[in-house]
């Protein structure tokens, strides 16, 4: 377990520096873990996993160490949701509902009811909000 903690302590600064979407990262890491990757593709794969991360070579080395630990991609997929109720989508659904249109509410609910299974047509529910989007403020603690 201590090896895992040491590795995560090295990973988290890369994610923070790149302002990575953590939910998407864990999903992509499970995909990466399941797919064969040769040494030549390692840097490209690191850049895909954490776009904008400093030290892509260091991240590629981290990924190689991660893969060498033998993580189970099926277990990773089982605990890392593809879809979460993201603030911008909640705001969109609530705004439409206030106008009497529950379509967005139903669609968002459909996405998060089965959050671990990627499905065609739900891609936007897996994406982070716009980088220039206004902060979402809630008053009910959700």
PLM segments and residue spans:
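Regulatory N- and C-terminal appendages and interdomain linkers associated
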Residues: 2, 6-142
